[in-house]
């Protein structure tokens, strides 16, 4: 059986909040078996903890945010969540000095890099549990849709449709089969993106105050404003897959299924998760044997 994992040691990360523009400090700590993904706001006295699960998702406008029953929240969790999922980590305590996870360079790579090189991953003596999708689950909203079907792998077949010359000149669809190595090499470095006109509007409304070319792909009327250009020719759709991996893992579980979407986004991901977990006959818990294709991908 494949085993649960955590960090080998604690690590510190510094950055800035995308929307607040303020400095943020993270400490990622090892956690015992069956702890799950725990976020701990240490800027509040006493500290407030969130165990990541679908019921805590409260806001999916521009990012994914968690909020407890007392209204305490943590926002922009998706890129860190994707890094934790992508590295196969099951148990971790994330201490944070703000209400917002730092945006870093707009991808999961800074988190992946520091976890691998400054901590490493420790195997724990307890079987890892997965959620298997048993029946097709689909949600639609206007011309957008997303579905998941039963599979013995975690795959994402996503398409976007942006009517902008910069994005439409790139491939807007991508099929990805999850594995730790493929996540690191194909997905983790894909950055979030935004249009200059939207960033200016958001900043005028005191949002995206930390947004710039150091933490996102910024798109002008006819070109990308980042001097270094794109990291992948299809970086936009790859980042959409990164967001989905992070959002699905906010449920607290690795979900085994074939995901397919047209015009995905945080809200569509959340709608799908709600429908999955609302209908218990659509999924089941299971451990996996080492010869299972999904485990081999890990």
Curated annotation (Swiss-Prot):
GO terms for molecular function: metal ion binding; UDP-3-O-acyl-N-acetylglucosamine deacetylase activity. Pathway: Glycolipid biosynthesis; lipid IV(A) biosynthesis; lipid IV(A) from (3R)-3-hydroxytetradecanoyl-[acyl-carrier-protein] and UDP-N-acetyl-alpha-D-glucosamine: step 2/6. InterPro entries: Ribosomal_Su5_D2-typ_SF, UDP-acyl_GlcNac_deAcase, UDP-acyl_GlcNac_deAcase_C, UDP-acyl_N-AcGlcN_deAcase_N. Keywords: Hydrolase, Lipid A biosynthesis, Lipid biosynthesis, Lipid metabolism, Metal-binding, Zinc. Zn(2+) binds at residues 79, 239, 243. It catalyses: a UDP-3-O-[(3R)-3-hydroxyacyl]-N-acetyl-alpha-D-glucosamine + H2O = a UDP-3-O-[(3R)-3-hydroxyacyl]-alpha-D-glucosamine + acetate. Its cofactor is Zn(2+). GO terms for cellular component: membrane. The active site is at residue 266. Its EC number is 3.5.1.108. It is an enzyme of class 3 (hydrolase). One of its GO terms (biological process) is lipid A biosynthetic process. Belongs to the LpxC family. Catalyzes the hydrolysis of UDP-3-O-myristoyl-N-acetylglucosamine to form UDP-3-O-myristoylglucosamine and acetate, the committed step in lipid A biosynthesis. This is UDP-3-O-acyl-N-acetylglucosamine deacetylase. It comes from Wigglesworthia glossinidia brevipalpis. The lineage of its organism: Bacteria, Pseudomonadati, Pseudomonadota, Gammaproteobacteria, Enterobacterales.
């Amino acid at each position: 059986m494949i085993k649960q994992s955590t960090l080998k040691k604690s690590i510190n990360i510094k950055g800035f909040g995308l929307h607040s523009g303020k400095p943020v400090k993270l400490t990622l700590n090892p956690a015992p078996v069956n702890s799950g993904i725990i976020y701990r706001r240490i800027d509040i006295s006493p500290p407030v903890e969130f165990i990541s699960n679908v019921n805590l998702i409260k806001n999916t406008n521009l990012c994914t945010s968690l909020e407890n029953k007392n209204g305490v929240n943590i926002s922009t969790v998706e890129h860190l969540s994707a890094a934790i999922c992508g590295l196969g980590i099951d148990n971790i305590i994330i201490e944070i000095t703000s209400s917002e996870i730092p945006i870093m360079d707009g991808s999961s790579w800074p988190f992946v890099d520091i976890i691998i090189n400054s901590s490493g991953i420790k195997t724990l003596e307890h079987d890892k549990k997965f959620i298997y999708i048993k029946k097709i689950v689909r949600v639609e909203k206007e011309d957008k849709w997303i579905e998941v079907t039963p599979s013995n792998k975690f795959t994402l077949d996503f398409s976007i449709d942006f009517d902008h010359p910069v994005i439409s000149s790139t491939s807007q669809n991508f099929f990805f089969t999850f594995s730790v190595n493929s996540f690191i090499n194909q997905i983790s470095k894909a950055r979030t993106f935004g249009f200059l006109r939207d960033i200016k509007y958001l900043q005028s409304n005191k949002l995206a105050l930390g947004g710039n070319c150091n933490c996102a792909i910024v798109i002008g009327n006819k070109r990308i404003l980042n001097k270094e250009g794109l990291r992948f020719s299809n970086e936009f759709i790859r980042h959409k897959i990164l967001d989905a991996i992070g959002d699905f893992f906010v449920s607290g579980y690795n979900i085994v299924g074939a995901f397919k979407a047209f015009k995905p986004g945080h809200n569509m991901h959340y709608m799908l998760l709600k429908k999955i977990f609302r209908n218990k006959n659509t999924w089941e818990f299971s451990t996996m044997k080492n010869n299972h294709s999904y485990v081999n991908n890990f």
